[in-house]
Amino acid sequence: TVKAKQTQRSHFSASQQNSSSSSQTSSSQTSTAGENNSSATNKTVPSESIDNTDKDSHAGGKKVQLNISTIVQRRWNYCAPATVSMILASRGLQVDQAQLANEMGTDETFGTHNSNAIKVLNRHLFGYDVPSGNQAGYRLATVANPNSDSEDMKRFKKRLIQNINDGYPMYYTIDNSKMYPGRSGEHNVIGVGYVLTEDGSDVAYVYYLDPSYLVQDSVYGGL
């Protein structure tokens, strides 16, 4: 099972360059995490910069991590807009969270549907909502079977490595209860890297940045 900051049943989205290595992640909908709105901020926190040849102290394998800055979500239901904003910023596009939320139809009581978030992401990044055929773009899929040897997990890890190596972050929907005891609901974060096992044959850990203002660290931001 992939460890570190990843749920046992994760939703993810990957940018793919062709149909043979098409998408990844979520048939379910993005939901809010029931977060308090009292300390919302638009602060950008620099993320840790790590050379992709570093050895991880736990797995002993190669670590690859994109140098992306955390954008903290402004409102309790803005996890998807903030995540998409980070992905766009990593590609040199600056789009305000409020604008993205409006385009995605982010709801005051629910949050954002993943399908809407990915359409808006593709629109800004590639110029179309839904990629077809061999077109590059983010697509949705689900890791329905979390077992490490399942086809779902193998496909996820293969595409994770491909996308991070190509410089494209991942769009994750995580189960809050798996990552943060006492919390509930689904939550969007941006996947920024991975660590391989010592022999390089498998993914041991994944890294993500969490836009929630409830989990920001003074040094590492949402990492």
Positions of predicted regions on the chain:
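Active-site-adjacent structural segments surrounding the nucleophilic cysteine of cysteine proteases
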Residues: T1-S19, S23-Q135, D199
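Conserved active-site-adjacent core of cysteine acyl-enzyme catalytic domains
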Residues: Q99, E103-L223
